[in-house]
Amino acid sequence: ANGQLADDMGIVMGTSHHEPMMRPHKDYTKRRKEVGPWNYATNKEGIDSFFIEGAERSRKYESIVTIGMRGDGDVAMGGGTDEENMAVLSDVIKGQREILGRVHGKDPAEIPQLWAVFTEVQRYYDKGFKVPDDVMLLFCDNNWGYIRRVGPWQEQRRKGGMGLYYHVDMNGGPWNDRWINTTTIPKLREQFNLAYQSGIDDLWVVNVGDLKPKELPIDFIMRYAWNPDAIQADETDDYLRQWAQQNFGEAHAEAISGLVARYSKYNLWRKPEVQSTNIFSVVNHCEVDRVTDLWRTLAHEADSVGQLMPQAYKDAYYQLVLYPVKASAGVAEIYLAAAKNRLYARQGRVTANDYARRVEELYTVDTVMTAYYNKVLAGGKWEKMMSDIHLGYTKWSMPKRDSVPQVVRVEPLSKPTMGVAVEGCETLSPEGELELPVFDNFENRKYYIDIFNRGTGTFDFKVKTDEPWMDVSLRKGKVETESRIWVGIDWTKLKAG
């Protein structure tokens, strides 16, 4: 039924890189006992029969047939050496082409076929494995959106041509990338242009996962594939504005295109499924604070624009802009806040508890936003579309449930107790000697000193400097939780040398 419907609508059908001869892997797993082991060296007859069924079932439809063979599922073939596997693969392809010729009643060279040069298969190609010239070579990215090679010059005249298999969604190693869009338009344009300019332009296959979270990259790739020369490297912002205008009208197109560009960029820094508390530094270059501010600013702007949306656009805005922005911001800040919580707890800061509460608050917000998307938005039209687990990954495979990083609670001391910490150092005074990073007059940066409370109540502090060229942002104050003082150098007061 699917094949007939696709053919009626002019859709060319095919199967994945590990599903040869128009047979989905599920076709095999349902009949594993009947077909026998997925091993061509020991079960040629059973597997050939399986392949014949696929060829016969699809012969009346317009298709492109994946040839070759990998392991049982999306895994490498067998346990032999590359040379042994290449010898088996050669027999597999010879047998597959004989089957295609018999079933279709014509020269196999007249039947569209591809060989996916994917993961371990690229090693075989690089070692000299060849397929007939009429077979398309489907080169692949690295599972994370970077093509592994441009079109080899010696392949650019091959009869079968060259194609690309590209991921904007990944379920597998090295890490999942499923929940939300993490791909920027400039990156997509760069990668597909590399393919296009080097002759990888006969077929582009894109792994889009569950479709809904990846609507933006899907739209761009389809437009770019239609006419690659129409979108130049310096025109990706124009594309985003046109996309925003098409979906939300002219009034807010500029603002929305900026929101979408930035959340995609920030997610590309660190995809949600690969977040941890160790990515950005709490003490160096104010990384955690800077990234937190970027995400919070973005989320605030998305809220502000959302309030201006006409009612007719509200649902679409939530799906395409507000949820991706705020949910991504929430996941990022959960790990950023947890990183601060852990360091501050080791230092005994009472503010460690504030960051523990922040982690819990953000998790609640994430749960509420996701429930709204799944249950309320558009009358529940997209139920379970945003049910992917996206918090608590420790390896590539999806956890059983969302979970936040473990946080630590601090029991304040019974009386106000001062602690001091400086930028670039995780230790604190009076437990260790503190030293600010080196100042220079090129960047002319300022560095901070944190004065914080480890107990209950308040205390007063004063700051003294030994040199007149030292600038401090605060000379005295009262601390209940913490206070940050910025230290800089007035280079005009320093003598040369």
Roles of regions detected by a PLM:
Residues 1, 139-145, 152-313:
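Structured mid-domain segments that build the active-site/substrate or prosthetic-cofactor binding neighborhood
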Residues 1, 30-48, 70-90, 172-186, ...:
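The substrate-binding groove and active-site-proximal loops of carbohydrate-active enzymes
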Residues 2-8, 40-159, 292-316, 328-331:
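Gly/Pro-rich turn-and-neighbor structural signature
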Residues 15-52, 159-167, 185:
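Active-site-adjacent "subsite" loops/lids of carbohydrate-active enzymes
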Residues 238-396:
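C-terminal non-catalytic alpha-helical accessory regions
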Residues 393-454:
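Beta-sheet-dominated interaction scaffolds and their linkers
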Residues 441-449, 481-483, 492-497:
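Short, solvent-exposed loop/turn segments enriched in Ser/Thr/Gly
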Residues 454-486:
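Surface-exposed binding patches on compact interaction domains or structured appendages
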